[in-house]
Amino acid sequence: MITIEDIKSAYNRINSFIVETKIYSSEKLNNNYAANIFLKNEVEQLTGSFKIRGALSALSALKEEGVEGVVAFSSGNHAQGVSKAAQIFDMKSIIVMPKDAPSNKIKKTKSNGAEVILYTRHIESREKIAEKISEERGYPLVKPFDNENIIAGQGTFGL
């Protein structure tokens, strides 16, 4: 279970790398739902998504442990987050992406220094491919879920 202390700890590890994004309120949404609704514009982040928060949190913790590289799988936003975080922390990143992922996401992931491994969706398992690479190279697999440092990092958008 992730606690507020975990989220604050993640924030302390990543705050010098993230963009402080603005919070907006929409009168139309507030009126439609009879509530105060707030929107946070995470498209302003380094990679255009909140996923960089979790990636920075996870990779900063791994870097502290002496890990030199990571493996991840994603169709786009997690791939860009992990590859950018790896670039920031001078780590190797290997990202498994589907061949039909948006070409701009593949290109951006590569431009962050990642080694991109393409697979055929619905025929191959991205998780099995990533697990095999992780085992062969000795790098941990950083999943976009089931990772407490990823979750705590994503939670920093609320601080």
Positions of PLM-derived features:
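PLP-dependent amino-acid enzyme catalytic core
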Residues: 1-159
